[in-house]
């Protein structure tokens, strides 16, 4: 009984505290108590589940995957309740879409006039992304000692890949340290943004930048903001796309630690090359052709943040849009809050392909796969290739479903790549200055015709 109950406990623990904070904001603005009631319901559910599973001490492999899935499902359902009961969303489907987009930090929205919504709803959107950014699973790992449960398997599943590592001997201490960095960077960004933005806008953008989420309190995202705000957000998007374990090593060894990390050099190099390639093909009179806006948009796509500093879907020639489309698949560093395949996996696959080419010429050669000074085990390479194949396969499947729902090919490919990579804005019907309400209308029509489609995702 305890082992069965632990899945629900880990998925729901802490949600009551989240609702309590949101209820205060909502009460101040609306003089309403509906979120206080929701917080009470959350506590009434969490406490009995915790009591039933308090003696469980470990996870089986099956439990690990169930907890991962339940964490996102439960968080999305709970996250949609304030949206729905606010009366500002026309249907529960719209509320659930916005909540899933927030928790998974995808940043896709069905709202066409964000600025008309009350601050409590805008804060809740931002806070959902902040909670989802480093992973609800990591948040629960930090709380697992209260349950007496080991969280190592959860941590390894939530942050897989060649670059995953424990930065402290005990996994719960690692999770807590990651959270401290996460909170610290969020507060630092808020402080810097508050010099040029209103208090509320500064805190919301700080909450959505560090998780590389992209929800904004402005209708045009970051497009109308000044150079200072764009520069600060650009810096923290790069920080959010960096391996958090690397931040810890730099704290101990100094700034040169960044330069010693091979993946970080690839990361910065890719940003520079992509930005220069786009600038080289741009016309000086074209909107968004300046260095800051171009670099901002490259980083926003690569890190899956999804902010828009310009309408990149109107860029010409088309090769510039195609380059951004490719960056949607790559993603930033492993161990970061970004989406996509992750740069470290791409590097590992390229090195493996090169090694296999050499082996075809020298059949007896022993060629280890190295990234920096580290040799990547064959088992990790196999898992990396398997992940890559699954990712690409699901991209084509998702594209097919979007086409079946009535989208043109450009919109379908863009929406699938954006959804898989947790980016948000895309191309075509879901362009940089558009929203996803048409996607819900297509899905609703398909449901009426008996076609059930479940589209969702979480950064990996």
Locate predicted features.
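Membrane-proximal intracellular helices of multi-pass ion channels
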Residues: 7-444, 458
């Amino acid at each position: 009984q305890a082992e069965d109950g632990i899945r629900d406990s880990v998925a729901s623990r802490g949600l009551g505290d989240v609702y309590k904070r949101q209820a205060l904001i909502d009460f101040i603005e609306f003089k309403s108590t509906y979120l206080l009631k929701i917080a009470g319901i959350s506590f009434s559910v969490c406490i009995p589940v915790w009591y039933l599973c308090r003696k469980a001490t470990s996870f089986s492999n099956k439990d690990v995957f169930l907890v991962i899935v339940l964490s996102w499902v439960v968080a999305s359902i709970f996250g949609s309740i304030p949206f729905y009961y606010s009366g500002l969303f026309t249907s529960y489907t719209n509320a659930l879409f916005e909540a899933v987009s927030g928790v998974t930090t995808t940043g896709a929205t069905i709202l066409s006039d964000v600025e008309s919504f009350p601050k409590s709803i805008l804060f809740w959107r931002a806070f959902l992304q902040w909670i989802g950014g480093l992973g609800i699973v990591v948040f629960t790992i930090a709380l697992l000692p209260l349950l007496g449960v080991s969280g190592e398997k959860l941590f390894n599943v939530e942050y897989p890949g060649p670059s995953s590592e424990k930065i402290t001997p005990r996994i719960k201490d690692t999770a807590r340290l990651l959270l401290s960095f996460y909170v610290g960077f969020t507060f630092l960004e808020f402080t810097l943004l508050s010099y040029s933005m209103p208090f509320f806008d500064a805190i919301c953008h700080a909450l959505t930048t560090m998780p590389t989420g992209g929800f904004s309190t402005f209708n045009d995202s970051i497009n109308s903001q000044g150079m200072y705000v764009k520069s600060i957000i650009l810096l923290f998007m790069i920080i959010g796309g960096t391996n958090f374990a690397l931040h810890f090593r730099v704290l101990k060894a100094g700034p040169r630690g960044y330069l010693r990390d091979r993946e970080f050099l690839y990361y910065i190099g890719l940003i520079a090359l992509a930005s220069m390639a786009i600038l080289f093909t741009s016309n000086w009179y074209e909107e968004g052709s300046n260095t800051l806006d171009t670099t901002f948009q490259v980083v926003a796509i690569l890190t899956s943040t999804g902010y828009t500093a310009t309408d990149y879907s109107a860029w010409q020639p088309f090769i510039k849009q195609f380059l951004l489309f490719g960056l949607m698949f790559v993603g930033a560093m492993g161990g970061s809050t970004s989406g996509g395949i992750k740069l470290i996996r791409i590097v590992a696959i390229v090195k493996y392909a090169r090694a296999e080419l050499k082996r075809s010429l020298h059949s007896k050669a022993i060629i280890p796969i190295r990234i920096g000074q580290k040799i990547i085990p064959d088992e990790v390479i196999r898992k990396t290739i398997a992940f890559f194949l699954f990712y690409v396969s699901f991209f084509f499947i998702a594209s097919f479903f979007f086409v079946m729902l009535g989208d043109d090919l450009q919109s379908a490919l863009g929406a699938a790549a954006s959804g898989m990579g947790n980016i948000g804005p895309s191309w075509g019907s879901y362009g940089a200055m558009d929203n996803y309400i048409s996607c819900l209308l297509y899905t609703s029509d398909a449901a009426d015709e008996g076609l059930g489609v479940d589209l969702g995702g979480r950064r990996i």
